[in-house]
């Protein structure tokens, strides 16, 4: 009998996973996606719908009767995957774990229950509640939707006068109209990526983040391995495995963000039961850790399938986000260098002649990225490559 494999969320970020699925024999590949903007693959059938519309998702699954379901790098797709896995008794994350992963308020409550170190927080839905929180806690504070994606709606509040603007800016990105306000923890931001193996969660890659500035909660680069000493690195990796266990995740990839303060205390920002975006799980972590997460996820998700895991040489990797000045693009040069360099694992610059570039305000509207690998000095290699990029603007 043929496998009926359903993959949910099939944009450019999922291409490495989709490529491997289409190599499988005796398998039909089905998909659900937001729209028809990504037409690279010939699926057996595909449903276009809002992934928050669970009625459409379940109806399509009922129609095809999948024997496997997968997703990666997308919170809403993760939620759909968990529901379909539960309904059809398939391998996958549980509905409980998916909800803890995508709902910041539920995750914060789980942290309290399990004694996971986290910032003091409160659930809010009004401006007055922010003022009340600020009376008990010193500025700066952070406000964020409980159900956003990336850094959309995450706003740092430095003074009493900034509260009203911050509230509405955050509310724009809240699906439920609910947000959390929390203490701002000053320190080094890091990410830890891992996988839930049969014996338990394992940390595979630690990276340090650089920010555009202190108030805008947007990263400009993420470096693997992180710029930390070996003792602290080992402490963080062990802590992450403990956090993932306490949150209850037991299937698939994990992607967690932490802040390390000046006392080397480790505060959880959030931990997702999925891979990190911008090819973090499918390109970056394998090339840094040597572990083929894509093949591992396929083998764990599809019964009676055991494909050979690919071999990767462990290297330094830099995910460099691009931040161009605003203006109308007349011409862009230097892409030929990115296309031919063996040090470039992947890149995405969705800018063409005539486009108007706006200022970066969140993870979602950054101007592109380049993923660079090197045995040593990956930042130097990255800078040399990116220096070839040049945008000429209309006057």
Task: Walk through the language-model features, giving the residues of each.
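ATP-binding N-terminal substructure of ATP-dependent carboxylate-amine bond-forming enzymes
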Residues: 1-96, 305-307, 324, 351-356, ...
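ATP-dependent carboxylate/phosphate-activation module, predominantly the ATP-grasp catalytic core
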Residues: 183-249, 253, 260, 272-296, ...
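A conserved helix-loop-beta module that forms one wall/lid of the active-site cleft
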Residues: 86-153
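A glycine-rich beta-turn/hairpin centered on an aromatic-Pro dipeptide
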Residues: 305-342
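Flexible, glycine/charged-enriched surface loops at secondary-structure junctions
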Residues: 180, 251-256, 307-313, 394-395
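Short acidic-hydrophobic, aromatic-tinged amphipathic segments that line or gate anion-handling sites
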Residues: 46-52, 122-126, 155-157
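A structural supersecondary motif
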Residues: 254, 267, 340-355
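Conserved ATP-binding module of the ATP-grasp superfamily
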Residues: 117-119, 136, 140-143, 155-191, ...
């Amino acid at each position: 009998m043929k496998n009926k494999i359903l993959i949910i969320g099939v944009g450019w970020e999922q291409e490495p996973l989709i490529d491997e699925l289409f190599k499988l024999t005796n398998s039909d590949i089905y998909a659900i996606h937001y729209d028809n903007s990504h037409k690279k693959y010939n699926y057996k059938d595909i449903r276009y719908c809002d992934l928050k519309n669970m009625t459409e998702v379940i109806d399509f699954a009922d129609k095809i009767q999948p024997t496997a379901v997968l997703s990666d790098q997308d919170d809403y797709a993760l939620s759909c995957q968990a529901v379909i896995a539960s309904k059809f008794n398939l391998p996958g994350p549980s509905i409980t774990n998916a909800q803890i992963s995508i709902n910041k308020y539920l995750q914060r409550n789980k942290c309290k229950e399990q004694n996971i170190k986290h910032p003091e927080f409160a659930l809010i839905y009004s401006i007055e509640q922010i003022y009340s929180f600020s009376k008990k806690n010193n500025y700066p504070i952070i406000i964020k939707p409980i159900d956003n994606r990336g850094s959309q709606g995450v706003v740092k509040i430095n003074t009493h006068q900034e509260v009203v603007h911050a509230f509405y800016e955050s509310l724009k990105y809240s699906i439920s109209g609910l947000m959390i306000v929390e203490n701002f923890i000053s320190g080094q931001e890091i990410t830890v990526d891992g996988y839930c193996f049969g014996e338990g969660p394992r940390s595979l890659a630690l990276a340090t983040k650089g920010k555009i500035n202190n108030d805008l909660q947007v990263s400009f680069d993420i470096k693997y391995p992180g710029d930390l000493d070996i003792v602290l690195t080992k402490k963080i990796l062990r802590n992450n495995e403990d956090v993932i266990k306490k949150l209850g995740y037991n299937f698939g990839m994990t992607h967690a963000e932490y802040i390390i303060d000046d006392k080397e205390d480790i505060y959880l920002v959030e931990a997702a039961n999925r891979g990190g975006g911008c090819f973090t799980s499918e390109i970056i972590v394998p090339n840094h850790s040597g572990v083929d997460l894509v093949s591992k996820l396929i083998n764990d998700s599809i019964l009676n399938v055991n494909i050979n895991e690919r071999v990767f040489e462990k290297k330094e990797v830099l995910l460099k986000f691009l931040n161009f000045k605003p203006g109308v693009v007349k011409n862009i040069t230097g892409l030929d260098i990115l296309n031919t360099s063996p040090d470039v694992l992947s890149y995405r610059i969705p800018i063409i002649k005539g486009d108007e570039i706006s200022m970066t305000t969140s993870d979602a509207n950054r101007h592109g990225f380049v993923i660079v690998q090197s045995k040593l000095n990956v930042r130097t290699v990255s800078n040399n490559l990116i220096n070839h990029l040049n945008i000429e603007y209309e006057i």
